Amino acid sequence: DDIKLSQQYDVLDLFKYMHQ
């Protein structure tokens, strides 16, 4: 499940990057 959390964070980072 830890990987799932990491993946979610990765998506969030990607979203932030796209929004930048």
UniProtKB/Swiss-Prot annotation:
Keyword vocabulary terms for this entry: Cell membrane, G-protein coupled receptor, Membrane, Receptor, Transducer
Membrane topology classification: Multi-pass membrane protein
Domain of life: Eukaryota
Residue ranges of coiled coil: none
GO cellular component, one term: plasma membrane
Location relative to the cell: Cell membrane
Main location: membrane
A single MF term (Gene Ontology): G protein-coupled receptor activity
Family the entry assigns: Belongs to the G-protein coupled receptor 1 family.
Function as written in the Swiss-Prot or TrEMBL entry: Putative receptor for octopamine. Octopamine (OA) is a neurotransmitter, neurohormone, and neuromodulator in invertebrates. The activity of this receptor is mediated by G proteins which activate adenylyl cyclase.
Name of the protein this chain belongs to: Octopamine receptor
Organism: Photinus pyralis (Common eastern firefly)
